[in-house]
């Protein structure tokens, strides 16, 4: 079998023998390049090892690779090649079939001739080759004439894809002033065509837009600077268009483009410059510290860190009065007040301000000094200022006994303005609520207005105001601290009430009490007190005093033999004097009780005379008190009497309590031995049931008990017992005032267990039913009316109740 078409012989052709065994491998050196079928004999000669004159033996398939150009656009199916079997004699007895990748969809075969055609457009970039299988069958029997074999159809590339920049558009940055040839960015284009076949995938780069500033390497796609000293301040953004063309850039090649946006980054190549060489500013003399006077600005064409500025005052007479700082957001210099200004002292200042870049690049220092200076003139404007006190604080000491109206200090203030307005003085009354002082409105003399007492207020802190007469809104103030000095105006005295005791068996010279004193004064040299007996007790025979020279004194007995019966209490007057000028003194009394003591001096009992306070009540008050007590007693007795004679309630409140209704009780008792059943009567009147009161005679109806006995048969003891039981229960019901006044039918399903009395239903009368008479039921009242009608005599009309 031989193949014809667009094919080339590989180095090794595989020949498969019939019945699935190999004939071997054949080395072929001849390549079939023709697009037309090769004559059978010529191809067979190529496939044979023997001389052509020899008779060739039967061989299997003869294969090669088929090559088909992609992107066929014709209307007819594309001819690929031809398959032929040695057993095909051209009579149509052989049928060729095709299977494998794309068989019947992409490729078809003429089953008679073996011609292969492509029926779909082929794209090498989607699929480069197809592997198919071919077989020759007997058309009549369908039996394989030769074993199935594989062959390959390769898609031959054409230049149908242009280069593409997969990462575009590009963004790049390069510093300004960069040297020529500085690398900016590398761009890369890819071509989907076969790089191993021709020049379809060979890409060449060129620049379409961006010259003369940039260039591109035709092979690598690296973009570089092509112009020196490119200045960002002149032009910052560049748009460069790069082209990639296949076929090595030859005519007819396909091309693709991309855009590269290049930005020149800033460098510090521009020094700062002040647009103004002179600034004129003004400030009020009352401007507070750190207040803004004005702003200066040095322009720098750079940006970012390269445009940062630092402003300083390098010269001028205002360096000590003003300061300058840099605003980091706007890079301006802010001039502020450094110390208080005074129009009267200095009316103008001159500053020399420098602005410089703190970040420099050495390679650009030759472009000039990266600093500049300007001159600032500042004028101080006059304002109407409040009066100023000199000094700014007053401290005054004054004795507490100073006379009212005494001048203790002269307060002085002046108007700092050129006009020097007149001033009026006053005291801020919120600082002197007690109004102890006042000030002369014209002279500023501070005087006392009330007596001073150091023991009450030892310090006074007041505020004196000074006001311009022409402009009352201009007010100055000064604090004045006044210390009140002490004078000896308080006599010493005992700090508390002293009460001592002396034993009856005390001896002469025995200590019974130590006393001390206090003085509200505060002399500079400290307090010193002197103790002695008062003049009226100077010759006291019982007690004496000894000064300890430490502001205390001892009280001693002068004799022994004290007796409670003779005198139980002694009052000893003591004179206390201070050391001030003038000397002040006071008399304090020491109370001494006489007590019984044991031998060791421990007090056992003190029984001084009872001092009763005189209590005297008038006769009218005493009578009023007794009258109130009597009225209260009468009221109590009256209340008790009324509670004792409270009216008792009636037995029957009203006729409505007697019910004539029929009430049904679905209560089923437990017989005679059911002691836990509830009592209806107790539920009707719980108070009577709880009290356990004896039944009272009903007022509405009394049963005739005596008449019952004549109707009860006496022939049987059992009947007599039952009769007595029924009569007793009937009597209890009639005597119960709170029992329901109506009859009811009770059904008892449970009659108890083992009752010795037996069931009432088993009772039998000694006589027959005809002999029994129930006429007595008519005498039992309304309760037994129904029974009387059922069992009573039928003769005569029924009784009426």
UniProtKB/Swiss-Prot annotation:
Cross-referenced CDD domains: Cadherin_repeat
Membrane topology term: Single-pass type I membrane protein
A single GO BP: cell-cell adhesion mediated by cadherin
A Pfam family this chain is assigned to: CADH_Y-type_LIR
UniProt function note: Cadherins are calcium-dependent cell adhesion proteins. They preferentially interact with themselves in a homophilic manner in connecting cells; cadherins may thus contribute to the sorting of heterogeneous cell types.
Compartments reported by the entry: Cell membrane
Origin: domain of life: Eukaryota
Record keywords, A-Z: Calcium, Cell adhesion, Cell membrane, Cleavage on pair of basic residues, Glycoprotein, Membrane, Metal-binding, Repeat, Signal, Transmembrane, Transmembrane helix
Keyword DNA damage: no
Residue ranges listed under propeptide: 35-59
Extracellular-facing ranges: 60-619
Segments in the Cytoplasmic topological domain: 641-801
Transmembrane segments: 620-640
Residue positions the entry lists as glycosylated: 261, 420, 461, 542
Location of the Cadherin domain: 61-165, 166-274, 275-389, 390-494, 494-610
Protein name, per record: Cadherin-20
Encoding gene, per UniProt annotation: CDH20
Listed GO MF terms: beta-catenin binding; cadherin binding; calcium ion binding
Mutation effect (residue 228 to I): In a breast cancer sample; somatic mutation
Predominant subcellular localization, coarse grouping: membrane
């Amino acid at each position: 079998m031989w193949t014809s078409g667009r094919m080339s012989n590989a180095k090794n052709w595989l020949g498969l023998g019939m019945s699935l065994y190999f004939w071997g491998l054949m080395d072929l050196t001849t390549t079939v390049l023709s697009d037309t079928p090769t004559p059978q004999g010529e191809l067979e000669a190529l496939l044979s090892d023997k001389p052509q004159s020899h008779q060739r033996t039967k061989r299997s398939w003869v294969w090669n690779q088929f090559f088909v150009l992609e992107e066929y656009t014709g209307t007819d199916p594309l001819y690929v090649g031809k398959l032929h079997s040695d057993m095909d004699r051209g009579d149509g007895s052989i049928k060729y079939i095709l299977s494998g990748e794309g068989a019947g969809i992409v490729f078809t075969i003429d089953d008679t001739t073996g011609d292969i055609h492509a029926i779909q457009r082929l794209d090498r970039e989607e699929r480069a080759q197809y592997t198919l299988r071919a077989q020759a069958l007997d058309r009549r029997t369908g039996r394989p004439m030769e074993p199935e074999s594989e062959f390959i159809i390769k898609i031959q590339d054409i230049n149908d894809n242009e280069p593409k920049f997969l990462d575009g558009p590009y963004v790049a940055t390069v510093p300004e002033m960069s040297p020529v040839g500085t690398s900016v960015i590398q761009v890369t284009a890819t071509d989907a065509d076969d790089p191993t076949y021709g020049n379809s995938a060979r890409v060449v780069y060129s620049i379409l837009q961006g010259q003369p500033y940039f260039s591109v390497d035709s092979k690598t796609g690296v973009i570089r600077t092509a112009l020196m000293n490119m200045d960002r301040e002149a032009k910052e953004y560049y748009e460069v268009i790069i082209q990639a063309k296949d076929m090595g850039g030859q005519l007819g090649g396909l091309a693709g483009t991309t855009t590269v946006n290049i930005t020149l980054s800033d460098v510090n190549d521009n020094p700062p410059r002040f647009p103004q060489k002179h600034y004129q500013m003004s400030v009020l003399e009352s401007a507070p510290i750190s207040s803004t006077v004005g702003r200066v600005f040095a322009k720098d064409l750079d940006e970012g860190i390269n445009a940062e500025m630092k402003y300083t005052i390098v010269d001028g007479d205002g360096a000590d009065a003003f300061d300058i700082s840099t605003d980091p957001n706007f890079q301006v210099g802010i001039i502020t007040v450094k110390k208080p200004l005074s129009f009267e002292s200095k009316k103008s200042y001159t500053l020399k301000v420098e602005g410089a870049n703190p970040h420099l690049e050495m390679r650009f220092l030759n472009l000039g000094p990266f600093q500049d200076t300007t001159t600032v003139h500042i004028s101080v404007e006059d304002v109407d200022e409040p009066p100023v006190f000199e000094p700014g604080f007053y401290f005054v000491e004054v004795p507490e006994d100073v006379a009212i109206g005494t001048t203790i200090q002269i307060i002085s203030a002046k108007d700092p303005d050129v006009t020097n307005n007149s001033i009026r003085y006053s005291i801020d009354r919120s600082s002197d609520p007690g109004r102890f002082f006042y000030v002369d409105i014209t002279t500023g003399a501070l005087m006392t207005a009330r007596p001073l007492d150091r023991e009450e207020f030892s310090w006074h802190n007041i505020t004196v105001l000074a006001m311009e007469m022409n402009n009352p809104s201009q007010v100055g103030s000064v604090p004045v601290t006044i210390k009140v000095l002490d004078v000896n105006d308080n006599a010493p005295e005992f700090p508390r009430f002293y009460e001592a005791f002396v034993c009856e068996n005390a001896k002469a010279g025995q200590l019974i009490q130590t006393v001390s004193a206090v003085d509200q004064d505060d002399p500079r040299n400290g307090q010193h007190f002197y103790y002695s007996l008062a003049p009226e007790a100077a010759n006291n025979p019982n007690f004496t005093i000894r000064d300890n020279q430490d502001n205390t004194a001892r009280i001693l007995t002068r004799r022994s033999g004290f007796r409670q019966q003779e005198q139980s209490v002694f009052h000893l007057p003591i004179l206390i004097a201070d050391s001030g000028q003038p000397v002040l003194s006071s008399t304090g009394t020491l109370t001494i009780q006489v007590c019984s003591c044991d031998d060791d001096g421990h007090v056992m009992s003190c029984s001084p005379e009872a001092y009763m306070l005189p209590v005297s009540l008038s006769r009218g008050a005493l009578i009023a008190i007794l009258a109130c007590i009597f009225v209260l007693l009468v009221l109590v007795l009256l209340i008790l009497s009324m509670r004792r004679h409270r009216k008792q309630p009636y037995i029957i409140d009203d006729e409505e309590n007697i019910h004539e209704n029929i009430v049904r009780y679905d209560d089923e008792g437990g017989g005679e031995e059911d002691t836990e059943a509830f009592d209806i009567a107790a539920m009707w009147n719980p108070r009577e049931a709880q009290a356990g009161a004896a039944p009272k005679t009903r007022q509405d109806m009394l049963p005739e008990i005596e008449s019952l006995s004549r109707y009860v048969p006496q022939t049987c003891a059992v009947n007599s017992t039952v009769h007595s039981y029924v009569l007793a229960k009937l009597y209890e019901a009639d005597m119960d005032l709170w029992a329901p006044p109506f009859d009811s039918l009770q059904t008892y399903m449970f009659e108890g267990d083992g009752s010795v009395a037996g069931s009432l239903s088993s009772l039998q009368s000694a006589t027959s039913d005809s002999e029994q008479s129930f006429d007595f039921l008519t005498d039992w009242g309304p309760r037994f009316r129904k029974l009387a009608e059922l069992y009573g005599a039928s003769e005569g009309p029924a009784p009426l109740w």
